[in-house]
Curated annotation (Swiss-Prot):
Residues 1-93, 126-173, 352-421, 956-1172 are annotated as: Disordered. Residues 1338-1476 form the Reverse transcriptase Ty1/copia-type domain. The record marks H401, N402, N582, N583, A1217, A1218 as: Cleavage. This is Transposon Ty1-GR3 Gag-Pol polyprotein. Mg(2+) 1 binds at D671, D736. Capsid protein (CA) is the structural component of the virus-like particle (VLP), forming the shell that encapsulates the retrotransposons dimeric RNA genome. The particles are assembled from trimer-clustered units and there are holes in the capsid shells that allow for the diffusion of macromolecules. CA also has nucleocapsid-like chaperone activity, promoting primer tRNA(i)-Met annealing to the multipartite primer-binding site (PBS), dimerization of Ty1 RNA and initiation of reverse transcription. The aspartyl protease (PR) mediates the proteolytic cleavages of the Gag and Gag-Pol polyproteins after assembly of the VLP. Its main location: cytoplasm. The capsid protein forms a homotrimer, from which the VLPs are assembled. The protease is a homodimer, whose active site consists of two apposed aspartic acid residues. Residues 583-640 are annotated as: Integrase-type zinc finger-like. Mg(2+) 2 binds at D1346, D1427, D1428. The modification Phosphoserine is found at S416. Residues 1044-1053 have a biased composition (Basic and acidic residues).
Length: 1755
């Protein structure tokens, strides 16, 4: 039946429908559809009518009532018409049944138009079931309705489905674009409502009013499918339909959510633009409303800056808030928070005024007189109605920022004022004076402030309790008044210079006076109506006059803007001068303490808190008047700005109030902070704080971890303390829900002690605000203290404890008492307190000798808990002590470099402050206390072990007996010490970047030794001893010797041996006489040397010179013949020349003394382990650098050195942005695109060559059948994720040929189109070097092959499509790939599997296990690198047979057959190889470097002398503050990537001598400072100068047919940042260097021996793998050797005594190493340090040493 109907109407197509029943489309700017169905109003007010006259035909319906919606009502059917819109056809309910789906197979094939299935339709009567329909259904969104004259009728609310049915319903328009979907879905929802389906539309909460029926779901699906074609749906809609194609309800719900969000944004913008506030509601509520709106808009991407927000807020202010519009118009940098401060101040003033309800006087003679007067009040508070702020945020003082100038100020003068003056003088604008309005006032010439808002007038202020004036000319009987406190509306202090009388002479010749305060720090002269009322003068604002109570008019009032003014002409001038007034305040004879000093003394607390504390005697010893508060208002502490920087203020009222009913110490708040990273193990990483709810008393305890037992110990301690000290019991402890508080152990403890745990709600920071705010405050103080003092970060908890002590003693502004007072304790005696980090000298009661200094420099931390002493940090001892034997070091405070503190000196203040305390100590001290060794009560910092940062100041170097560098002083008397700038050390933040160093031109360290004959005046003599710069500080077994070189600057000998010193000159700083030290024997010299840090390992002395190889023989490692000697015999070790005796150079005296940093160095330097061994340490002279390259350096000026120290490391401020930015840096592009090479190439010849290469590539692609040429696919038919973009790339090869390559964009390939588990293998570089070395020793032929278009031989399994090449001109078509095109993720793996299978099955090869791409059979070895093959064999015919088989399958080219007996040159994987069979092989990259380096734009210096080494020891990379523009930063990082990338490529290929420098600089790629770039340039310069160097191999001639594989290992202990060690290994095969490695140890070693063990253990796995490869390729016996210069390591390896190192940190690794040596039959041998060529891998060396260790194997 249905098919018959369709055949009768063939023009009706599936999926199309039409209707003449339409509703008028309303076009409006407003949203035509509200957000939810529950709130939707009818979009159309009534149903539309037909264009022609309508007639209705009643119809009977037997359709049963639908329980989910209203019963269908009879509808009027329009009669036939001649218009373009045919008559609507109705259908029966049976026809609406979706049973037709089974016939057509899918809902999309249903023959019914969707709106015909709406439940509102029913059979109208007998008529044709399928009348003529239009060709389309609906109209596009952009098409207006074709109907006219539509009428509307009211419809009921959409909240209920029991509504009357509309007679005619217009279908929704067709969706024509994904961008129109939001508008379309609104009309679609309206269509559903009109179809009586409003109840199924999701509401705001995403749920419909009622459940949808199956028929309604069918109707919903079909209408959506027809009117919203799938190609025009947004992506998020397609994603929903891809899961369930019938889930239209979810689409509607999501759409409503999006519309709700858009509506919220629009509502917020409208609300913000129409703000109104007059003080009728609380200011807090108004602020919360505005800030919430701004935050929502910002979160939704609509940024509202402070300027716009302030303008919108001020525009809506009215009433008493209106004046903020005018007083803020010059404040360009005002923030919303600052504006609300003013609003809060005015609101609080209003509330105070309402509570006090001031009385207004009435004039008895005139009831209409509205004279207002306030009774005078004695409170010294001035609420300025015109608060002003400065243009910047330096000061919050209400200063005089005037708003008008003298050019437009009124100048008319009229002294006569009649009583009949009733009209107010209105001046709405200062220019109104020129519009005929006369101002009946005159100005006083000498008091005219021309930039006032109304010059020559006083501002009448009803809110001010005192009169303030800026000019001193009107003040009578002036006197100082330091005790008066005046604040403005924002509670900011206003400094007062003087107090006096202000005398008036009014027009009725009456005179009167009031009190006046003089201050220049106000915006306007304020006349208090309260004080006028006190002298019977009131202001009548109805008549605008000042008058007495009897009605006598005294002066007129001028209204200008929103304020009222009175002329200054009625003031009587005084004869006092301005300087007299200004100097009144400073005439006191007693000098006061400066506020900056007190601010720092009291832990950087704010001025208001300090004043409260002094006023309430919570701080004793001096009073509030003893402090100079004049600078407190505008003082800006830079350390506070840095340390206490916050995002915004804490929200008021966030604290809960329910704890107020508890007694002191019954309710505690607690919280844990941490961890703090990159600290020594002895320093705490956490702290736990406690705060009492009632007294606000605070406790802090350090923690090393957050384990249950650690937390339990702290709880036990504080509960016992409160119980014993305060006789109180804790009832409740409030804490968060961290696991450290919710564990069962603590819960049982609290339950046992009867304590209720009160846990806060998860993520509710407000409920836990007390503890969290305390932690934040303490951390702010901590950062500020560390910033101000410069102490290292591991003392962070000392700063926390200092802050806790002080803050427990400061009064709270609310309670007016301190926590100590609430707890019943006495106030803090400030005379016992020292500023945090104050330099002091601590008495050493037990020095090492009688001639050593008695004082040790230190830094005061905080008062001791356990004694009357002070906790002092001693950097030289790396510990803190509790002592009273200290002296405050006087001198200027030297703080941060960026702030100038030199103008501040508090020595005299500090002496005055502590005088009484020290006199008390002196008078009561019976005997000298020897408490230096009393450890601090803080065990966590009693011994600071392995601390990477040390204080760097000359004083500590001069007097510390344990410092690594003997003192270097230049003092003439003791006064020189007091003037030295002493500052605690700065450390490099480990979160910024690794602090590393690289070789460069720097002065060598010149250590000094104090003379025995030091003078008693405090001066010290220095012993000038010529010492060479250290070559290594890592190994304690490396001996240290004094120099014996005759010429210190140009000595060619390797001067490291022991020697006797004769006639060592001594220069005294106190005179010019030179003294000599008698000839000292070697033994006597050693007696003076004190080794402070002996090695952790064995007792075998390694400080003696070892001139010969000392083999360690064991039964396991040595056969009968001397295996060690045979292993070392043919290695390329240096030949040490004889060393002539050393004479001292006179130039040595001129070298300036420099103190070595006490941190570790990756390039040498003096560390703690070298303490007092400087005479026999390895040094080198300053002139021992042969380089003359002119590269700028970030060196410090010797004349301007502060404490003779290197510049402090500075933190990078843009690290996070820098790391993000570098991710976006693209690698350098060396190829050309199609348009660059062909389309727009102006070089005709080059263009022709590229065209030729292009056609050659296309022909090769077609030849290889790369894609399916039989069929082209339409782009719309293919899944987009299977379409791979492709492109042609062009480049010019090194041999001059032009090459084109058609590649796929694998970088944007979808992950579903390849198997991520497949690997693309290539030959390892060690395998290639091993094969080349064996080829030289076995006279192998080497043949080089290339397979053209190798990837195209591999089939592709996945279904992938690409765009055709450009010349085909089919941009809208796709072709399917059949081969692995270059660039695809899987192409490399596919080719590897293809060629591997062919070599194994067809060529009879097998792959060496563990070494991918290395194939071998009994005759040939093949190394495969993508499409390059290198063949090795004794018989050239064997290679030819393999080549013949390869040519059968692949297009194989013979690059070099290698058949000549003469020298043959190869270019194998970037290496330029010269090979003569049976003689030698040379590996280099001269041609490649000659071509590439000049293209790097490096400032090369070809004319200067060549560099002798890639760097030199002794230079630190300073982490300076890196402030670069983003583009400049990206450019420099890009440059570093290119330079280090090239250096790495060269280094890992064959220049193993450069690996240390490359590895170090690679760590600073993201920190391209000028110093780092200069060092990189120097490295590239060295590579350029030595580009002709080659790795030299000679054929070995062993006595027996064996292969010898040796690894030489070395380690530099603790020379990397944070005491990491640098390890290095060099691998040799038959005496030929085949590889090297230099890297930073992954773990921190605790001794030299552990570092050496770590280096050896890192080399063993590769050694074993290479051994297996060699045995597979060459069937000869193999001997494996392991060489090290650490005898202690060897003794551990060969020893059978496990107790020797069982309890040491490296015991496990040592045991494993012993097993590996034994199990792999490794021969462990000792090599002399001076012959250890692996030394170049671990540290920078002097030029001569570097050449000596490398000239045997690379030259």
């Amino acid at each position: 039946m249905e098919s018959q109907q369709l055949s009768n109407y063939p023009h009706i197509s599936h999926g199309s429908a039409c209707a003449s029943v339409t509703s008028k489309e309303v076009h409006t700017n407003q949203d035509p559809l509200d957000v939810s169905a529950s709130k939707i109003q009818e979009y159309d007010k009534a149903s539309t009518k037909a264009n022609s006259q309508q007639t209705t035909t009643p119809a009977s319906s037997a359709v049963p009532e639908n329980p989910h919606h209203a019963s269908p009502q009879p509808a009027s059917v329009p009669p036939p018409q001649n218009g373009p819109y045919p008559q609507q056809c109705m259908m029966t309910q049976n026809q609406a049944n979706p049973s037709g789906w089974s016939f057509y197979g899918h809902p999309s094939m249903i023959p019914y138009t969707p709106y015909q299935m709406s439940p509102m339709y029913f059979p109208p009567g007998p008529q044709s079931q399928f009348p003529q329909y239009p060709s389309s259904v609906g109209t596009p969104l952009s098409t207006p309705s074709p109907e006219s004259g539509n009428t509307f009728t009211d419809s009921s609310s959409a909240d209920s489905d029991m509504t009357s049915t509309k007679k005619y319903v217009r279908p929704p328009p067709m969706l024509t674009s994904p961008n129109d979907f939001p508008n379309w879905v609104k009309t679609y929802i309206k269509f559903l409502q009109n179809s009586n389906l409003g109840g199924i539309i999701p509401t705001v909460n995403g749920k419909p009013v009622r459940q949808i029926t199956d028929d309604e779901l069918t109707f919903l699906y079909n209408t959506f499918q027809i009117f919203a074609p799938s190609q025009f749906l947004p992506t998020w809609v397609k994603d929903i339909l891809s899961v369930d194609y019938t889930d239209i309800m979810k689409i509607l719900s999501k759409s409503i959510e999006k519309m709700q969000s858009d509506t919220q944004e629009a509502n917020d913008i409208v609300t913000l633009a129409n703000l109104q506030y007059n003080g009728s509601t609380p200011a807090d509520a108004f602020e919360t409303k505005v800030t919430n709106i701004i935050d929502r808009l910002n979160n939704n991407g609509i940024h509202i800056n402070n300027k716009v927000a302030c303008q919108l807020i001020m525009r809506g202010l009215s009433g008493e808030y209106k004046f903020l519009r005018y007083t803020r118009h010059r404040h360009l940098n005002m923030t919303v928070a600052e504006l609300f401060l003013d609003i809060h101040a005015i609101y609080e003033e209003q509330q105070g005024s309402r509570n006090s309800k001031p009385n207004y006087r009435r004039n008895p003679s005139d009831e209409k007189n509205d004279s207002r007067s306030y009774t005078n009040t004695t409170k010294p508070k001035v609420i300025a109605r015109n608060p002003q702020k400065t243009n910047n945020s330096k000061s919050k003082t209400a200063r005089a920022h005037n708003v008008s100038t003298s050019n437009n100020s009124p100048s008319t003068d009229n002294d006569s004022i009649s009583k009949s003056t009733t009209e107010p003088i209105q001046l709405n604008n200062k220019h109104d004076l020129h519009l005929g309005q006369k101002l009946t006032e005159s100005t006083v010439n000498h008091t005219n402030h021309s930039d006032d808002e109304l010059p020559g007038h006083l501002l009448l202020d009803s809110g001010a309790s005192r009169t303030l004036i800026r000019s001193a000319h009107h003040i009578h009987s002036a006197s100082s008044n330091p005790d008066i406190n005046v604040v403005d509306a924002q509670k900011r202090n206003i400094p007062i210079n003087a107090i006096g009388d202000l005398q008036f002479h009014f027009q009725d010749n009456t005179k009167t006076s009031i009190k006046v305060l003089h201050t220049p720090n106000i915006a306007y002269d304020l006349l208090s109506l309260n004080e006028l009322a006190a002298v019977d003068i009131t202001a009548c604002f109805t008549k605008n006059v000042l008058e007495r109570s009897d009605g006598t008019v005294l002066a007129p009032i001028v209204k200008y803007g929103d304020f009222y003014w009175v002329s200054k002409k009625y003031l009587l001038p005084s004869n006092i001068s301005v300087p007299t007034i200004n100097n009144v305040h400073t005439s006191e004879s007693t000098r006061k303490y400066p506020y900056p000093f007190i601010h720092r003394m009291l832990a950087h607390a704010n001025a208001q808190t300090i004043r409260y504390s002094l006023k309430n005697n919570t701080i004793t010893y001096f009073n509030e008047s003893d402090v100079d508060w004049s600078s407190a208002i505008d003082y800006q502490c830079p350390d506070c700005l840095i340390g206490k920087s916050t995002k915004h203020r804490h929200i008021k009222g966030s604290r809960l109030k329910y704890q107020n009913s508890y007694e002191p110490f019954q309710y505690l708040h607690t919280d844990i902070f941490g961890p703090v990273h990159n600290l020594p193990k002895s320093a705490p990483s956490y702290f736990i704080s406690f705060t009492d709810e009632t007294t606000k008393f605070r406790w802090v305890y350090p923690l090393h971890d957050r384990r249950e037992d650690s937390i339990l110990d702290v709880f036990t301690t504080i509960l016992a303390f409160i119980k014993n000290q305060f006789q109180a019991s804790v009832l409740v402890i409030q804490m968060d829900r961290g696991s450290e508080y919710t564990n069962r152990t603590l819960h049982k403890f609290l339950e046992k002690n009867g304590i209720t745990p009160c846990y806060t709600t998860t993520a509710d920071s407000r409920a836990h605000g007390v503890a969290e705010r305390l932690n934040r405050t303490l951390l702010d103080d901590c950062r500020t203290q560390l910033q101000c003092s410069g102490l290292p970060n591991h003392l962070w908890f000392s700063a926390i404890e200092f802050s806790t002590i002080v803050r427990n003693s400061l009064a709270s502004p609310k309670s007016k008492k301190s926590a100590r007072q609430h707890a019943g304790l006495a106030g803090l005696d400030i005379s016992t307190l020292l500023p945090f980090g104050q330099p002091v000298i601590v008495n050493d009661h037990n020095p090492n000798s009688k001639i050593h200094p008695r004082g040790i420099p230190g830094y005061a931390l905080h008062p001791s808990r356990n004694s009357y002493g002070y906790i002092i940090y001693l950097p030289s001892l790396k510990k803190t002590v509790d002592t009273t034997n200290y002296v405050i070091l006087q001198g200027k405070e030297s703080r941060l470099d960026q702030f100038n503190y030199d103008a501040l000196t508090f020595d005299e203040d500090l002496n005055r402050l502590t005088a009484s305390y020290h006199s008390f100590i002196a008078s009561n001290e019976i005997q000298e206390s020897n408490d230096l060794n009393i450890e601090s009560d803080h065990d966590f910092q009693s011994d600071i072990e392995l601390h990477p940062e040390q204080p760097r100041n000359v004083l500590s170097k001069a007097v510390s007996p344990t410092d690594s560098t003997p003192p270097s002083t230049h003092t003439e008397d003791s006064k020189r010490v007091s003037k030295t700038n002493i500052r605690a050390p700065r450390e490099v933040d480990p979160n910024i970047s690794e602090s590393n160093i690289l070789p460069s031109k720097k002065r060598s360290s010149t250590p000094q030794i104090s003379n025995i004959e030091s003078t008693g005046s405090g001066g010290m003599h220095k012993l000038n001893v010529p010492l060479l710069a250290p070559m290594s500080q890592s190994n304690t077994h490396e001996s240290s010797y004094a120099s014996k070189s005759k010429d210190f600057r140009h000595s060619d000998s390797y001067s490291d041996n022991e020697t006797n010193h004769t006639n060592v000159p001594i220069s005294s700083t106190g005179g010019t006489n030179n003294k000599t030290v008698p000839q000292t024997s070697e033994q006597e010299t050693e007696k003076r040397i004190i080794h402070r840090s002996p090695s952790i390992d064995t007792s075998s002395s390694e400080s003696n010179s070892l001139h010969h190889v000392v083999p360690i023989k064991t039964s396991d490692t040595c056969p009968k013949e001397n295996t060690e000697e045979s292993i070392i015999a043919d290695l390329p070790l240096p030949d040490l020349p004889p060393e002539p005796p050393t004479e001292l150079s006179d130039s040595f005296k001129e070298l300036p003394p420099i103190n070595s940093r006490q941190t570790n160095s990756s390039l040498g330097g003096i560390g703690d382990s070298n303490a007092y061994t400087t005479i026999n340490s390895k040094k080198r002279s300053l002139e021992d650098n042969e380089t003359e390259i002119k590269v700028s350096r970030d060196t410090w000026n010797t004349k301007n050195m502060r404490s003779l120290e290197p510049p402090r490391s500075k933190k990078r401020i843009h690290l996070i942005a820098a790391v993000k930015a570098v991710k976006s840096i693209k690698p350098i592009r060396t190829t050309l695109r199609y348009d660059e090479a062909i389309t727009y190439n102006k070089d005709i010849k080059e263009k022709e060559k590229y065209i030729e290469a292009y056609h050659k590539e296309v022909n090769q692609l077609l030849k290889m059948n790369t894609w399916d040429t039989d069929k082209y696919y339409d782009r719309k038919e293919i899944d987009p994720k299977r379409v791979i973009n492709s492109m042609f790339i062009f480049n010019r090869k090194r041999d001059g040929t032009h090459k084109a390559r058609f590649v796929a964009r694998g970088d944007i390939q979808h992950p579903d189109t390849y198997d991520s588990g497949m690997q693309s293998n290539t030959v390892h570089h060690y395998a290639l070097m091993t094969s080349l070395s064996l080829a030289l020793d076995n006279n192998y032929y080497i043949t080089q092959l290339d397979i053209s278009s190798a990837y195209l031989y591999a089939d592709i399994k996945e279904e992938l499509y690409i765009r055709p090449p450009p010349h085909l001109g089919m941009n809208d078509k796709l072709i399917r790939l059949k081969k692995s095109l270059y660039g695809l993720k899987q192409s490399g793996a596919n080719w590897y599997e293809t060629i591997k299978s062919y070599l194994i099955k067809q060529c009879g090869m097998e792959e060496v296990r563990g070494w991918s791409c290395v194939f071998k059979n009994s005759q040939v070895t093949i190394c495969l690198f993508v499409d390059d093959m290198i063949l090795f064999s004794k018989d050239l015919n064997s290679n030819k047979r393999i080549i013949a088989k390869l040519k059968m399958q692949y297009d194989t080219k013979i690059i070099n057959l290698g058949e000549s007996d003469d020298e043959i040159q190869y270019d194998i994987l970037g290496l330029e190889i010269k090979y003569q069979r049976g003689k030698y092989m040379k590996l280099g990259m001269e041609n490649s470097l000659t071509e590439k380096i000049p293209k790097l734009n490096v400032p090369l210096n070809p004319n200067g002398r060549k560099l002798g080494a890639p760097g030199q020891p002794g230079l630190y990379i300073n982490q300076q503050e890196l402030e670069l523009e983003e583009d400049d930063y990206k450019m420099k990082v890009h440059e570093m990537q290119k330079l280090i990338g090239l250096a790495s490529y060269v280094g890992y290929k064959f220049r193993f001598d450069l690996l240390y420098y490359i590895n170090t600089l690679a760590q600073h790629i993201l920190f391209p400072s000028k110093q780092v770039l200069d060092m990189t340039y120097e490295l590239i310069q060295f590579i350029w100068n030595t580009r002709d160097k080659q790795l030299i191999w000679h054929k070995s001639k062993p006595v027996k047919p064996t292969n010898k594989l040796v690894v030489i290992s070395d380690a530099s202990y603790g020379n990397q940042p944070y005491y990491k060690s640098q390890i290095g290994n060099i691998y040799l095969l038959n005496g030929k260097v085949i590889g090297g490695k230099s890297t930073k140890a992954s773990l921190t070693c605790t001794s030299t021996t552990e570092a050496e063990i770590h280096a050896i253990s890192e080399s063993v796995p590769l050694l074993n793998n290479l051994s297996y490869l060699i045995q597979e390729l060459d069937k000869k016996p193999i001997t494996k050797g392991l060489l090290t210069d650490s005898k202690s390591t060897i003794s551990i390896i060969i020893s059978n005594n496990e107790e020797k190192f069982r309890n040491r940190f490296f015991g496990t690794k040592a045991m494993r190493l012993r097993d590996e040596v034994s199990g792999n039959h490794l021969h462990v041998c000792y090599i002399e340090t001076k012959k250890n060529i692996a030394d170049v891998m671990t540290k920078p060396l002097p030029i001569k040493t570097f050449k000596l260790l490398t000239n045997k194997w690379i030259h």
